[in-house]
Amino acid sequence: MTQHKRRVAFAATVAGIALLAAGCASGTAEDTSGSTTTESATETVEGRIAVAYEGGVAVLDPETLEVVDEFASEEFIRLNTFGDGKTVAVTTSAGFQMLDTSEPALTDLVFEATTAGHVVSHEGNTVLFDDGTGTSTIVATDAFADGYDALPETTTYTADEPHHGVSIVLEDGELVTTLSDRSGAVALHAHEDHWDEEAMSADCPGIHGEGTAADEAVIFGCENGALLYADGEFVSFTAPDEYGRMGNAFVSETSPIVVGDYKNDPDAEGYLLNAVTLIDIAAQTYEVVDLPDEVQYTFRDIARGPGDLAYILASDGQIHVLAPETGELTDAYPVVEAWEGPVEWQDAHPAIKVADDIAYVTEPAANSVHAVDLTTGEIVSSVELDHTPNEIAIS
């Protein structure tokens, strides 16, 4: 596989740079929450499951899958892990609404966004990206440790133009974010009233998705391969096909190997995919592995789990276990009935999320959610909901 390395200067001006000082942060001190802290809030319940359905969201117990509570919302919402063990960011037309899964309560706290997009949590910071303005809002991941009385202080960075982008803050405070023309990414260091550029690459057309692997290596998907940021430099990986799109990275912060989705036909109908990308960030190698015909999946159907293995919830109804080091499928666990790919990406179809050794799998055709022990393949609990599950998130 071809790879090339490049470092490019970045001279574009930055619009809407926010001061980092607390007094100039964009968070408001005004109390806008309908959920106040109570004595019971000190006994935080972590790891609950949020399941979106048409017109609302349910909170499930992670062991029994019992529905703890349900909350009305908009017709279509998305769910994003905030990173603190209890909060889920619910994507609505108003922005990012905070769901407290511990209480539980769908609070009135909303980080306003014109087009709420990706949410990335890493090393104590959570970044909310507004596609409609190109603004990254940086929030301390533990901001709601004492309750949801008010929106916390934030820091913001706004790109030159609105775009469907994503950002991450590294352990040293460095912000890595997509370029506004979606041609690549830039790494920035924050100062009191500006951001200094560390590195930039414009070698990633159609940049989409983000993941952080071992040694804090950040990977992005491109329409011609992938883009890696590590040790202050960008490295580009070129796909074997002229159009070879990786749109999502499935990573483990203890593994040097990234598993990505892969599409090589821009005109293909539907959303089912039949190959994966394997990127070894240590060896800096890139490989595309074709899967058996029956192993087809969408962007919701791959997760990393025990042993840093990859788990693919395929359209044949099984979870297929993939060894990233070899690209081989080593096992398969029947979980749901066989299913067809969605007509639109927003349509409800099976999804998988993993916490420790347990995979949580939605089965929209049966209005069900299943918990699967990935070390044995055993379904340890199931629940039938009153609604059709769509997206799922682990708090």
Give the location of each predicted region.
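Long, acidic/polar, low-complexity amphipathic helices and coiled-coil-like
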Residues: 101-221
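A short beta-strand motif characteristic of beta-propeller blades
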Residues: 63-72, 100-115, 145-159, 195-202, ...
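Blade-level signature of beta-propeller repeat domains, shared across WD40, Kelch, NHL, RCC1
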Residues: 364-395
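Bacterial signal peptide processing site
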Residues: 25-28
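Short beta-strand elements that form the blades of beta-propeller/WD-repeat-like
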Residues: 44-53, 80-97, 119-138, 166-181, ...
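Repeated scaffold domains used in trafficking and secretory/extracellular systems
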Residues: 36-41, 73-86, 110-125, 155-172, ...
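C-terminal motif of bacterial Sec signal peptides marking the signal peptidase cleavage site
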Residues: 20-23
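Acidic, serine/threonine- and glycine-rich low-complexity intrinsically disordered segments
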Residues: 182-301
